[in-house]
Amino acid sequence: MPIVLWVVSSFSLRAQEKDFATWANAGFEYKLKPAFTVSGGLEWRTKDDLGKTDRWGLKVGGSYKLLPFLKLGAGYETHYRNRGADGWKFRHRYRLEGTLSARVQRVKLSLRERFQHTFDGHRDEFRLRSRAKFAYDIPKCKLEPYASAEMYNGLNKTEHFGVKRMRYRGGITLPLSERWEADIFYCRQWEKDKRKDIVGV
């Protein structure tokens, strides 16, 4: 309980700038072996209440199922971002992650820990992202609702592992075919001085 109160209070002491955005993603996963999967995707994000494109993104990655309950992964992303008066700029990111998962009857639980390093030639940003996710497999229904909470901790020298961002997300996944799946979601993102409401697919 004290931890929850600390996280909430850290984002509620100052007036926040608000924004509404959309995120659109299209990607694929392909199993090279039963335990090894490669993936890739394209991303488009908006900002300023849908008025401007925020960024385009390209990502590739792979994951390996080390144990029935443990998956390890790594990946690379590049972002082409709208920096306003500074124009459009590239930045790059690599990530390393591990995911623990379990199933209790129809309830699916997972905990993912992700280290990421983001850089643009001028600034390096190091983050540890911790995400807890809950999903429910509805009997005789293809829809699968889920909810997750994710915390970003700063790893740069002066950040002292402080909470830099929180994301609360709820959505529904729907298989469209044997190889395609849709994910429709709403996400509330909190930072120290801004809040963002996001609808995505």
Named regions from a protein language model:
Residues 35-40, 69-74, 105-109, 140-144, ...:
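Repeated loop/turn-to-beta-strand initiation elements of outer-membrane beta-barrel proteins
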Residues 27, 61, 97-99, 131-135, ...:
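Outer-membrane beta-barrel architecture
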Residues 1-20:
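Bacterial Sec-dependent N-terminal signal peptides
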Residues 16-23, 46-55, 83-89, 119-126, ...:
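Solvent-exposed loop/turn segments connecting transmembrane beta-strands
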Residues 16-65, 71:
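Start-of-domain marker
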Residues 30, 64, 100-102, 136-138, ...:
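Residue-level signature of outer-membrane beta-barrel architecture
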Residues 98, 197-201:
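Outer-membrane beta-barrel "beta-signal"
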Residues 42-48, 76-82, 102-106, 115-119, ...:
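Transmembrane beta-strands of outer-membrane beta-barrel pores
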